[in-house]
Amino acid sequence: MADSKGEDLATAILKRKDRPNRLIVEEAQNDDNSVVSLSQAKMDELQLFRGDTVILKGKRRKETVCIVLSDDTCPDEKIRMNRVVRNNLCVHLSDVVSVQSCPDVKYGKRVRILPIDESTEGVTGNLFEIYLKPYFLEAYRPIHMGDNFIVRAAMRPIEFKVVLTDPEPYCIVAPETVIFCDGDPIKREEEEESLNAVGYDDIGGCRKQLAQIKEMVELPLRHPSLFKAIGVKPPRGILMYGPPGTGKTLIARAVANETGAFFFLINGPEIMSKLAGESESNLRKAFEEAEKNSPAIIFIDEIDAIAPKRDKTHGEVERRIVSQLLTLMDGMKKSSHLIVMAATNRPNSIDPALRRFGRFDREIDIGIPDATGRLEVLRIHTKNMKLHDDVDLEQIAAESHGHVGADLASLCSEAALQQIREKMDLIDLEDDKIDAEVLASLAVTMENFRYAMTKSSPSALRETVVEVPNTTWTDIGGLESVKKELQELVQYPVEHPDKFLKFGMQPSRGVLFYGPPGCGKTLLAKAIANECQANFISVKGPELLTMWFGESEANVRDIFDKARSAAPCVLFFDELDSIAKARGGNVGDAGGAADRVINQILTEMDGMGAKKNVFIIGATNRPDIIDPAILRPGRLDQLIYIPLPDDKSREAILKANLRKSPLAKEVDLTYIAKVTQGFSGADLTEICQRACKLAIRQAIEAEIRREKERAENQNSAMDMDEDDPVPEITSAHFEEAMKFARRSVSDNDIRKYEMFAQTLQQSRGFGQNFRFPGQTGNTSGSGNNLPVNSPGDNGDDDLYS
């Protein structure tokens, strides 16, 4: 209970308080730019009369003034306004606005109103006489500085903007008010820039972090008296860190727009100067400028560029800048309403002196969003997109593991581009205008999103090639028990995390496949990553080792970091024996680099966060030389022996290999499976490939022969068009291929694996006959059941029984 209460307190600042003057926006019945409608009961409650002027407050500190009228059909908690008023308040339908009486509104002496250039194209004549004069004469209209409004006359609407009012910021335009409308029209681009300013509702996927930032920034800037009353200093700085593309800079801009504070942006590298002392003076100027315009927010983007660790930097300038930043942050006056925000994606390379309380008080991790966060981000990016009915955003959010906000934005634009490509045959690029029907038919479908998903990969993993492989269970013949165990290991924690919570258990972390070469160990790892739609990072053992001291361990760290940031993720170590040999025996190998790599892998496996679904699969055909520390439970806790296939498995492998090939009916795969005892999966694949090759060779030779015959007797060329000479792979091809068939694994090797499996079985499976006292009767049947992966029982591999 305490936990849920804590949750509530953490995001309490985001909850909107209920007040009688907070109303939900609804579409207006009459299309008047200066009128809003309320129910009579709500007007009585707010002590408003019909025709009163009210001030409305919307999002991003936007406000406007209107005349209020009563409307009996309007529900009590709603307010009706048309699109013009909504745009002036930056709100949409069903958003919330606050209404207050505005008794101090005066008649205006002078107002300046300019048209917006786009809407006046092709219009000549006096705009004032045709548009503005009739608009303001018909009613006493209240206007607010910065408002836009549309006037319809002479067959076409024109949009105007209120540039100045006297008195500021709002007044009523009466008959004696002087209206100036001289000057150049306002450019639409400038207008849209202010409209497209970012607000809190444009940020998704970091609700908790936003709550922390709001209480750190909005409370000191808006209500410093709160801190005075309690007797503590308001916080001074916030450091936001996290991977690129999660929205750190976006949050800073949104905070500035929503608080209405002066926003001063410092891009880290821009401060640097070649002249001595100038870099520090640039920093001082920025702080002075912000203090003059308080309340203000200083935002330092990429702070690691100007405040690196002083003991690590060689340049004197960087050290001086760090010292200057420290003294500036300490010297900020108590009274000045100034907050410093900084963003970086390398928090550990910042000087530690900056990270103490009183400078950057709070460090906020803006991490990779979860499925709910991704859904929020997708909704924000698709709110202006035309989507087809079949688009399921929840499905896309669930499948886009490891994507940050920037990746999701690119996903949406890629899907939209794909939709345009599909309609390309209807669009003529030479034409000036595109047919309205084509534009109307554009709608992004789920298929477009599916295509975009194949093209986009999480930005955290761009440099390591992460692919979700396209191998499925059908590509793997046999090994049913192993497949089942793998599904339990990887698919269950990803798809049914609630069950693990219910039974209070953490899913196991890793598996080691061992067995003779060519039995499908690598193939299994690929298939499991594909089946549960997890990201898949394949680590080739020898690639991790480099000639530089300490670099090999850093490579291991990086790979694990990337896997964690793209969870759920399968890390596949192929040829594990090359990097995880038993320690102590590696004398004279680059100063014990291999030992250090193993130590790093061990610590990374232990330190893998409990909440991250990262699975490790190792594959080796030399399990005897692997360090025993890696094989303990909690690291690679499940050792799965992948034996040579038995009769049924061999038949399944042959079928899997030949499932796309045309096969003659007389080819008896069961018989081939029976005679190929001791063959591995790779050997069987080789037989199939050789049979296919022989069929292809025969088909090509027949074609060449036919061409020659055709050239010799051209007259009867038409009659010679008979059937395909080699329509399918016949038994003759297989008989020929079997002459070259060979076993790649000797009996001797297999005995080694069997021995290793046996010793493991004995060392681990000592409790096969374990019973609780007094319960012998209940479980007598299951007493002799070995685990599915016990290679000791002959049922699993009857090759040499």
From Swiss-Prot:
Listed EC numbers: 3.6.4.6
Function recorded in the entry: Necessary for the fragmentation of Golgi stacks during mitosis and for their reassembly after mitosis. Involved in the formation of the transitional endoplasmic reticulum (tER). The transfer of membranes from the endoplasmic reticulum to the Golgi apparatus occurs via 50-70 nm transition vesicles which derive from part-rough, part-smooth transitional elements of the endoplasmic reticulum (tER). Vesicle budding from the tER is an ATP-dependent process. Involved in the ubiquitin-proteasome system. Important for oskar mRNA localization and/or anchoring during oogenesis.
Binding site for ATP 1: 244-250, 345, 381
Subcellular location: Cytoplasm; Nucleus; Cytoplasm, Cytoplasmic ribonucleoprotein granule
Residues bearing the modification Phosphoserine: 716
Reaction catalyzed: ATP + H2O = ADP + phosphate + H(+)
Effect on the protein upon substituting residue 437 to A: In ter94-26-8; arrests early in oogenesis
Protein name stated in the entry: Transitional endoplasmic reticulum ATPase TER94
Highest taxon of source: Eukaryota
Binding site for ATP 2: 518-523
CDD domains, sorted: RecA-like_CDC48_r1-like (cd19519), RecA-like_CDC48_r2-like (cd19528)
Family: Belongs to the AAA ATPase family.
Tissue specificity note: Present in the mushroom bodies of the protocerebrum and in the glomeruli of the antennal lobe. Present in nurse cells, oocytes and sperm bundles (at protein level).
Ranges of Low complexity composition bias in the record: 776-785
Region (Disordered): 764-801
One term of GO molecular function: protein sequestering activity
GO biological process assignments: autophagosome maturation; autophagosome-lysosome fusion; cellular response to virus; dendrite morphogenesis; endoplasmic reticulum membrane fusion; endoplasmic reticulum organization; Golgi organization; larval midgut cell programmed cell death
Keyword ATP-binding (UniProt): yes
Record's subunit section: Homohexamer. Interacts with tud, vas, papi and AGO3. Interacts with Npl4.
GO cellular component, one term: nuclear membrane
